[in-house]
Every structure is written in C-alpha cells, then in structure tokens.
Amino acid sequence: MMNHHYQQLVQKLEEISHLNGVMSTLGWDQEVMMPLGAGEARAKQISALAGGLHERMTDPALGDCLRVLQERNADAMGAVERCNIHEALRSYVLETKVPKRLVQELAELSSRGHGIWVMARQQNRFADFAPVLKRFLSLKKEWAHCVAPDSQPYDANIDLFERG
C-alpha cells in the first residue's frame, strides 16, 4: 500500500519536474535566443505554463497522497523517501495558499519585465523599468500575505531561500 502511494507521488513529482524543465528552457531561450518582439508572446506562454504547474502542484489528489504517506508507516520508509515526502508536503502547503491568478501574474510580469529591463539598461533609462519593479514588489507583498499573513513580507519571501 505504501509503495503504491509513494509511486504515485514520484510520478506526480516527476511530471511537475518535467514541466519546470520546460519553464527553465523557455527562460533560457528568452535570455539567449528569442528574437526581439517575441517578449509579449513569451510572457503569455510562461504565464500559461505557470498556471498549469500551479494546478498540478495544488492538485487535491497530490495532497491526499502526501497525507496518506505522512500518516501511515512513515517509520517503514527510508530517509530519502521521508525527506521527499516532507519537502513535497512543504511545497504543497505553500502553493495551496497562493491563488493561481497571482502565480500567473507574477510569472508573466517577471518575463515581460526582463525585456523591459534589458532595454532600459541598454538605453540607460532605468525609469522605464520603475513601473514593472513597483508592480512586482506589490505582487510579492500580496504573495507574502497569502503564505504568511502574520509575517513581514521580507521574512515570507526570504524563507524560500533561507529557511527559518
């Protein structure tokens, strides 16, 4: 029984990982190969993919699978499996606190903002980037309020990189 649930978890996490790989490839292409003028379309692609990823990462079936694995015979599993379950559950809990709309808007703005930043830097017109930065900070504050409403926005965001 445990083996079946763990295999389901691995299958779901592999699919998420593959989609994250596609996201990384789109980002790499944007930085290296993408032709000028394609930024708007790429931002929409990244937003759509971010939405699909979010749906998979917040799928109730994934949550059910994680809860079953966490509650039943955790001692019977190896350290690697327990760590995978712990990290997947941590990600699941975090992602379920954030609405899909916000995930997509952050992804789209980040992609679109990159092109604006590149042009602003080339032309030494950093004020052109200010509205993007202002909106991005506003969205990150909203994200922080979703995941940790009782914390400062900085603390909620830094916890992604420096836990604790």
Where are these regions (language model features)?
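A well-structured
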Residues: 1-163
